[in-house]
C-alpha cells in the first residue's frame, strides 16, 4: 500500500528547532484527527507518547508517533520558518513571482528566490509516489493545484497541475486552523475519511451519471414510467426566479436524473416549451409525480419547495419522506447544511 502524503504550508518555530514537520501543537492535533478518521490506528505506545507530549510539551514525543506510522509521509511547501509565522515573508509583487503560479495572498506572489522549495517538494512527491496527497491548507493547494480558496475546494478530489503534475489531491483545512476554529474539526475528519478511501487508488473516479436534459413530453413520460413509478425514494429539487419555477429535477436513484426546464433565455418567448398547451401538459405530468402518495420523496430544505409549489401552482406534494437538511441538522446541529457542503463530505 502506498503512503498518503501530507503537505502543509511552512515550518513553525518548534518544527524549525526540531528540523522536522508537524511536531508541534498542529502535529499533535493532526495525529489525533488521522487516528479518528481511520488513516492511522493508535496503539498503546501512541497514546502514551501523546499523553507525555501534553503533560511535558516535548515535541520529540510527536516525532516518535510519526515514526510509528510509515503509512503517512509529511512535509511542507516551505521547509523554512517565516518570521512571526507570516507567509507574506515569501511574497512580493507579481514581477518577482514564480512564473506560472497565481498569487498566494491578495495580489502577492511567492518570490522566484523560493522556487527551489517547490523543486524540493516535487522531488519528495516523486520519491514517495503517493496515490493521494492531502493538501493541508491554502498554501499546499496553491503549490500543487495552482489555485487558492481552501474553503470552497476542500473535500474535492483534484489532479495536481503545478510542482508535480497528475497526482491526486484532496485539500482540507490546516490543523493550525482547527486549533483556532474548532467548529471546522468535524469537517476535516470527514475529509480525512474520504482521503482514506481515495488513497486506495491513484486515479480520480467519478461515478457514472445518466442525466436527461432538454426533454420532450414523450421523454418525460418515458422517464416517469421507466424510473419514477417504481422507485423507492425520489429526490426532488426546484429552481425558482421570482414567482416562477424555472426548472425541476427528479432523481429516482443516485445515478439517474431528469431536469425539466420551464424557462429558456434562448427563446424569444423566454419559455422552454413551444406552446402553452405543451407547458400545461408538462405541469400535469409533474403534478402526477408529486401527488403520487406511493412514491416517498426526498428534498433539501423541502419546506421551501413544497410551499412554493402549493402557493404558486396549487400543486400538493404527497409523501414527503425525508429532508437532507433536517437530517444533517439532527446529526450535527452545529454543522453547515448547504447542499454543496453536504455533497463535499
Predicted region positions:
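A polyanion-binding, active-site-adjacent surface
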Residues: 1-203
